[in-house]
Amino acid sequence: MLRISSFLCVALSIFSIAADAATASLIEQLTDLSKRFSTAIIYNTSLLAGLTVEPSTQTTLEQTLDLWLTPRQLSWQKTASGIVIFQTATSVPAPAISIPETNNTQVIEEVTVTESLPTPSNGDAYNRNYQQAINYAQQIKSNYVGQSEIAVGAMLNQLPAENLAEALQAVPGISITRDRGEALNINAMGLGAEYQLTLFNGHRLANTENVRNSNQYGQQHRFDIFSAGLFSNIAVYKTTNSSLPSGAVGATVNLLSDDPLAYQDNNLQVMLTTAALEGEQNLQPSFGLTGNAKTADGNLAVMIKMNYENRLQRQFQFETWHWGENGGAPQPYQWPDINKNILVPTDGLALTIENEDRTRATYYGALAWQATERLKLNTLWFRSDTDFSFDEHRISINPQSQSAQAQVNDENNSLNQFVFNAVNAKTSREESNLYYANQTIQVDANWQPSAHLPLTLSPFYSSSKANSKTKEPITRVHVATSPMQADVALQNTSVDNFNFTSNLGLVSSYSHISQMSKRTINVLNEVQEWGIDSHFSAENSWGLQALDIGFLHSTQSYHYARKDISLSPSALEQLPNLDGRWLEPIANQFSAGFMNAEVQPWLIPKSDLLQLYDIDLPFAEMNESDRLNSYKVSFASKEGYISSQWQFEQVTLSTGLRYSNTLSETQGSQLTKTGGVAPINSSNNDSAWLPSVNLKWQPSQYWQWRAGFNRALNRPNYSDLNPKLHVNSGGLPYAELGNPNLQPVIANTSTLSVNWQQQSVSAQLLGFNHHMNNFIVEQAASFNYQGQHYNSLQRTNDGQAQVNGLQASSQWQLPQYSQWFLQSQLSASITHINKADVSTSAGNHFKVEGVSDWTGNLRFLVSDKKWQAAFNINYRSDFLEQRDISNNASSYVEDYTSTDLSFSWFYSANASLRLDMFNATNETLTRTAKTDYASSLMKAEEFGRRVVVSLSLRI
């Protein structure tokens, strides 16, 4: 579906040997034919070796194949992966073609694929056989000139993964960022999620946004809207491709839909799934359906996919929000007789139970029409609807130093034991119902104006819209505890004690309701793109092979609206006294591996007290705070490109140049000098020339060397452009200010790699270096708001950054067979970042946020005809999550290893049963607050193991 010209712009690098004028090698002629018509041609090399043909004067692909193959008892047939050539059986009709599924087949040795990257199609053999999917992906990668990775079929759906981001961990160099135990964003090429770009058939996707709190991801794509098996082909460009939209310094992930016309038969596949969280009895059902149909003449085809999923999650957390050096902490949080460099908590210490109930429905429809031999029309509709319900229970302590004692952990230079004699504590409940929707519509055409001219024109239109909102206002209710003593003791990665002397199960342990508030957030992100791509293939075995020219008009709009309201202090005082009508016990005992002592149950406010007691808390017109937190950002881009590919003996050269001109506009509100709020509109125009040069040298059959230079740009996050004022609600007083004048980050990236590939083993070593100008960094200044002095933090383009690293990967089909299994595959990848440093004009030096020094993935799969078992291990070393330039300590995510297991039983070709276990080791994810001299436990999270059972039926 939607064969986009980005995959047609690179010609195949198969080496040619000159033939005499009368005849030429059939293999050479097929190679030229593949390049001329931009079509994959798959054949057994030994079948065609030594055959020669006369150059064809026919004008169509079909006529040429018939002319060359029929006299030699050869036939051809279109399949999902391209045109397959096979030997005609004597007196027997030609069979339907698929790549053999024999476990020991060496596909790379036997099959030649004349295509640079996968077309948007779905090969059945690659979906069901992991080894063949690996081999096919390796072959495609081998033919591409630049730095890329391919994931097809079984690589995405035969290893355990809860969503598409987790499936993408099979791609060397990609790591993930987790939220609530599930992958949310991807990281690649030594850079965090904000430097990656996700495309759908070569076009930008609108992004859903976090609306549960004030954190905003902006252009960081949230992968929790995609199930793991939704796509069968994914291309990951590790360096820029001139024919694709600009916007990524890191990797560009291109999600490719299926081509309905590629399927030979009508099919219907149903998947029934149930899941359960460890220790829970509630089963979570899921349902999936995939179907395709084609008319008798084979010119019109349709495909539909539908998936419904329910997910229950319970997460146990110890969390703090801010730690700072004692000497710079606010007065209530300073501890006397303690060194000023000792880390102390400047905000709450809390235990939290987070209950999540999520339902996700995904719909996908594609229609393809081969109107004429030279004209094909494609349409696609995709929609994802996700509902989240959160019920969060928390008991927290305000760690003020008055009437309290503390002990210093000399090893970490931080406070780690606290005794609060008259503790300032509260129990809280937050309830939220959130809605995330993404809808994408795409239309394109592939038209060859003349049968005598190898030119293809591909006009396109894409519209993507994402809405993220609170279905009902988020409600927060805080209840203060009565005076009592509390004890807290922390270790580096665990909690020894979090206890209160009074019985928290009694209503008498609580004094009054201290806060009732509501919040609504509505975010609308829209992307529209239209343009045309053109591809010209030259019929030369030397020199120019392909030329691509295109134009893109793209508009992105982002509207963030937030409103807050709280019950006034006077209204809170008028509420009735607390009794059993207001509070109820927590439904689940707090139990986590990082907790070294039993936690007594506590009471929480009853669900939805505002409605239960008719407490009127309506939203009025937007106040100053609402206007400061709401904003609009839009980008309007016009881009054009030209790219070419050249063949010289053992060297293939790909060059490209893209021009981007973008008008950015920001609408918001900003404080005036007199303390009022005034609207502000800002616009900026940026343009950039983005060249790319990639070289591939193949000195022998098994070795390939690649070198490249690319320039790319990365636009600022939407929230950074908002001329906002966000005042921190806890810890040190500081304010965040937006900057609508931010410029895009410009990066020059150079790469060098070597690939070694044999029948059953392949390996790659890649070195890369990013040099980034206009790097966005935070700067601090003094600010006064409503009589309070704040340190203001504002992002500027004052930085320069350099990131370089090495990436090694290997695929190995193990030469071990037994009566128990026929195939075993080991895949491994590791990335080491040697340098990830930022420098500013003021002489400051620090690390790039979101970058781990080490990431790795290990996958092992063993199978027989009737079963398959696999494990997937992913590792990510500690990294700087958020740098703090005020007195607060920076936050780091500690190293984390996730292990997922899978077992499948194939009853028949049409029925299979699968068991997955996610987070098998149930490792705790921890965050640490750090300065140059001290560290302390900041947060610990435990997600629990999840077991999923799936039944797949094909009709």
What are these regions (language model features)?
Residues Y875-Q882, S904-I955:
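C-terminal beta-signal and adjacent terminal beta-strands/loops
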Residues R204, E209, S557, Q701-T749, ...:
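Surface-exposed extracellular loop regions of Gram-negative outer-membrane beta-barrel proteins
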Residues N213-Q220, G229-V236, S243-Q334, N355-Y363, ...:
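Outer-membrane beta-barrel translocator/receptor signature
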Residues A19-P95:
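N-terminal export/assembly leaders
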Residues S762, G767-M772, I776-F783, Q788-R883, ...:
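Gram-negative outer-membrane beta-barrel transporters
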Residues V423, T427-E430, Y436-N438, S625, ...:
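Outer-membrane beta-barrel signature, preferentially recognizing the C-terminal barrel domain
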Residues Y136-K141, V145-S148, A165-T208:
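Extracytoplasmic beta-strand/coil segments of soluble accessory domains associated
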Residues L30, S34-F37, A89-N157:
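Short, acidic, small-residue-rich periplasmic hinge/interaction motif at the N-terminus
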